[in-house]
Amino acid sequence: MLRNTIALRSFIRTQSTRPYPVNVEAVYYAPLKLPIKYGDLVADIQLRSYDNENLDFYSDFILRTGYYLGIPLTGPKPLPTRRERWTVIKSPFVHAKSKENFERHTHKRLIRAWDTNPEVLQMLIAYITKHSMAGVGMKCNFFQRSEISLDLGSDANGLEKSLSNIDELYSLRNDDKAQTSAVGQKVLELLDSPDFKKHLEKK
């Protein structure tokens, strides 16, 4: 059906003598794409359909929409086709020998968006969802980058104290007597701690 539509457009274009507007003239050519500048991947748009013609038509529509919104897009990249087969009996009788095979192909396309503001990307998704085609499914994965912050909170003091104790023991590694005394002192502190004593209490 898509090939017939393209052939009909080409026939009408050759028969017409009027100049077309630029946006209408662009329909007869491949969709334009903006170059990738920073290489920042922001979204993956995966399309699925049982009919590859509608899938290619909708992919073309997404590329044109992204171009006019200023979004660099790559694709559509054909993904492996999923093939499913079922064998069922023709007769309602359970021991029937005649069987029938059914097969279904799921075609997939992948379009990637780059170097785009999240607000503009949401506008693209909203627009192509509003004008979606019947029989074509869409799944979008968003990628966002944020800073990593380390917040130890109340455990920071305990961690610093433990590190200071370890440093103190390593500083005494050449003095056996001082090291033995330091270790014994730490053992006594642990034995006198309330957390350790509560386990020694008889119930």
Curated annotation (Swiss-Prot):
Question: What residue range does the UniProt record give for the transit peptide?
Answer: 1-14
In alphabetical order, the GO MF annotations are: structural constituent of ribosome
Q: What is its main location?
A: mitochondrion
Which Pfam families does the annotation name?
Ribosomal_S10
Which domain of life does the UniProt lineage start with?
Eukaryota
Protein keywords: Mitochondrion, Phosphoprotein, Ribonucleoprotein, Ribosomal protein, Transit peptide
Q: Which residues carry this modification: Phosphoserine?
A: S193
Q: Name one GO cellular component term.
A: mitochondrion
Q: Which InterPro entries does the entry mention?
A: Ribosomal_uS10, Ribosomal_uS10_dom, Ribosomal_uS10_dom_sf
A GO biological process of this protein is:
mitochondrial translation
Q: Where in the cell is it found?
A: Mitochondrion
Name the family the entry cites.
Answer: Belongs to the universal ribosomal protein uS10 family.
Kindly give any further remark recorded in the entry.
Answer: Present with 8480 molecules/cell in log phase SD medium.
The record's subunit annotation is:
Component of the mitochondrial small ribosomal subunit (mt-SSU). Mature yeast 74S mitochondrial ribosomes consist of a small (37S) and a large (54S) subunit. The 37S small subunit contains a 15S ribosomal RNA (15S mt-rRNA) and 34 different proteins. The 54S large subunit contains a 21S rRNA (21S mt-rRNA) and 46 different proteins.
The free-text function statement in the UniProt record for this protein reads: Component of the mitochondrial ribosome (mitoribosome), a dedicated translation machinery responsible for the synthesis of mitochondrial genome-encoded proteins, including at least some of the essential transmembrane subunits of the mitochondrial respiratory chain. The mitoribosomes are attached to the mitochondrial inner membrane and translation products are cotranslationally integrated into the membrane.
Q: What is the official name of this protein in its record? A: Small ribosomal subunit protein uS10m
Taxonomically, what lineage is the organism? Eukaryota, Fungi, Dikarya, Ascomycota, Saccharomycotina
Q: Gene encoding this chain?
A: RSM10
